[in-house]
Amino acid sequence: VLRNDGYELACYTYANIGYGESGTAEIEADLALWKEEVVPILGEVDTLVFAQNSDIDDGTAAYYGDKIALLQKYGFAKFIGFCDEGSSWVSLNDGYLRQGRLMVTGSTVAHNSEWFTGIFDTANLLDPSRGDVPA
């Protein structure tokens, strides 16, 4: 139903593990479970959103090595990581797209409000009666 309404679905890993800190064997085991348990329900997806604020490489450079080869073997061509500097970015590489996303959470809104300047006014989002938001 969601796809019929124009939504594009993505993988967030099977077990919510950080692929940056994981070895290829652990990533492959996670992807095998995704393919076995989730793909029959959702269908194939080509977008991977890295869990745990993780990425398989630092910075915005092109990926290389065993991890990107493994992810591409499982059909992924779009990779979305987390930007902790407050600005999103997109990098189009040979055969895949890499993007850094800006996460909107209570913590980022409370402690990094400058990240959202020009997007929305963070002062209107947090309820002061709820107390401090942990960092």
Label each residue range with its predicted role:
Residues 8, 21-135:
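C-terminal active-site subregion of NodB/CE4 polysaccharide deacetylases
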Residues 13-17, 54:
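Active-site-proximal loop/turn and secondary-structure-junction residues that shape catalytic pockets
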